[in-house]
């Protein structure tokens, strides 16, 4: 491809555009029900990074006219105490979405607590039941980062007359909240999907076959740009702070002359993650309003 031809998939700009749409949908819910959509965020312990993420999610709620209830619990919290709090929120009709901020202190059974969240309020897409339903093509809220990536790609594909069907998609990474659901979503969209991970042999060969490449492995610039097929659509879900700002899991410097489209780091996938959480909470509120 010629130099500097790739489309920059600007997640920050799209998230801002979607927030305008969500504000209108929130206003419609309030007008219909007299109740403001509410996201409950549970923060266990005092991890500063987690507190920052929760604050960012609360700010995103405010921007679209939603409310955010912040539930703070001490680091000494037990699994039973956290399960009781989740049950309380499950049974509160004013709460439309529940987010348990990861990670929780090591004495807590995180999976049991995730799975205790009501499926209708699992707007972060963390329950095993929700993942199973999504895998079977049944309605469920997807894990926010891969769902945000799909939305970003759908907008780009629709604008450019591209279809997912038949594309070779390669996902590098197999985490429960990113790699696995990402692969399943691409499969649901009729892509031919390959999942690569730390035990994969000949990673370069797999990457080189990708029409759609998703880097979700958590290793700085593990995937080299010269492995990438010309004309591929490149999605980098990684972020690793550096003195210059940060890098992802894919070597992006010079990617403009190789890829058809790519997500920048930062400003690509990250903004879509929180945006998807808010969008799915609005959807939950809309469904509750129709019940």
From Swiss-Prot:
Q: Name one Pfam family in it.
A: THF_DHG_CYH_C
Binding residue positions for NADP(+):
173-175, 198
Gene3D superfamilies in the cross-refs: Leucine Dehydrogenase, chain A, domain 1, NAD(P)-binding Rossmann-like Domain
Recorded hits in CDD domains, A to Z, give: NAD_bind_m-THF_DH_Cyclohyd
A Gene Ontology molecular function term of the record: methenyltetrahydrofolate cyclohydrolase activity
Q: List the GO terms this entry assigns under cellular component, sorted alphabetically.
A: cytosol
**Keyword list, A-Z:** Amino-acid biosynthesis, Histidine biosynthesis, Hydrolase, Methionine biosynthesis, Multifunctional enzyme, NADP, One-carbon metabolism, Oxidoreductase, Purine biosynthesis
- Top-level taxon of origin: Bacteria
**This enzyme's EC code(s):** 1.5.1.5, 3.5.4.9
**Catalysis performed (reactions):** (6R)-5,10-methylene-5,6,7,8-tetrahydrofolate + NADP(+) = (6R)-5,10-methenyltetrahydrofolate + NADPH; (6R)-5,10-methenyltetrahydrofolate + H2O = (6R)-10-formyltetrahydrofolate + H(+)
A Gene Ontology biological process in which this protein takes part is: L-histidine biosynthetic process
Note the PROSITE patterns from the entry: THF_DHG_CYH_2
Q: Which InterPro entries match?
A: Aminoacid_DH-like_N_sf, NAD(P)-bd_dom_sf, THF_DH/CycHdrlase, THF_DH/CycHdrlase_cat_dom, THF_DH/CycHdrlase_CS, THF_DH/CycHdrlase_NAD-bd_dom
**Where does this protein act, in terms of pathway?**
One-carbon metabolism; tetrahydrofolate interconversion
What the entry lists under HAMAP family is as follows: THF_DHG_CYH
Its function, per the record, reads: Catalyzes the oxidation of 5,10-methylenetetrahydrofolate to 5,10-methenyltetrahydrofolate and then the hydrolysis of 5,10-methenyltetrahydrofolate to 10-formyltetrahydrofolate.
- Record-stated family: Belongs to the tetrahydrofolate dehydrogenase/cyclohydrolase family.
The record describes its quaternary structure and partners as:
Homodimer.
- Name the UniProt record assigns to this protein: Bifunctional protein FolD
What's the source species for this entry? Psychrobacter sp. (strain PRwf-1)
């Amino acid at each position: 491809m010629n130099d500097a031809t790739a489309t920059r998939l600007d997640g920050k700009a799209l998230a801002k555009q979607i927030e305008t749409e969500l504000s209108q949908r929130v206003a419609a819910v309030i007008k219909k029900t007299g109740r403001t959509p509410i996201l409950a965020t549970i923060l266990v312990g005092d991890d500063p990074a987690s507190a920052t993420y929760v604050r960012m999610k609360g700010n995103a709620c405010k921007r679209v006219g939603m409310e955010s209830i912040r539930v703070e619990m001490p680091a000494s919290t037990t699994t039973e105490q956290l399960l009781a709090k989740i049950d309380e929120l499950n049974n509160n009709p004013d709460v439309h979405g529940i987010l348990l901020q990861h990670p929780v202190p090591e004495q807590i059974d995180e999976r049991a607590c995730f799975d205790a969240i009501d499926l209708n309020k699992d707007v972060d897409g963390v329950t095993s039941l929700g993942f199973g339903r999504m895998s079977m093509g049944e309605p469920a809220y997807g894990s926010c980062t891969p769902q945000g990536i799909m939305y970003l790609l759908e907008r780009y594909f629709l604008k450019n007359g591209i279809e997912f069907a038949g594309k070779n998609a390669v996902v590098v990474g197999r985490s429960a909240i990113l790699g696995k659901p990402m692969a399943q979503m691409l499969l649901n969209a009729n892509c031919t999907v390959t999942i690569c991970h730390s035990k994969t042999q000949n990673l370069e060969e797999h990457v080189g076959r990708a029409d759609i490449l998703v880097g979700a492995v958590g290793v700085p610039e593990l995937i080299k740009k010269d492995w990438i097929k010309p004309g591929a659509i490149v999605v980098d879900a990684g972020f690793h702070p550096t003195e210059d700002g940060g890098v992802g899991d894919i070597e992006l410097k010079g990617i403009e002359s190789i890829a058809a489209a790519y997500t920048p780091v930062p400003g690509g996938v990250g903004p879509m993650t929180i945006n998807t959480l808010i969008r799915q909470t609005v959807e939950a509120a809309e469904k509750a309003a129709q019940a």
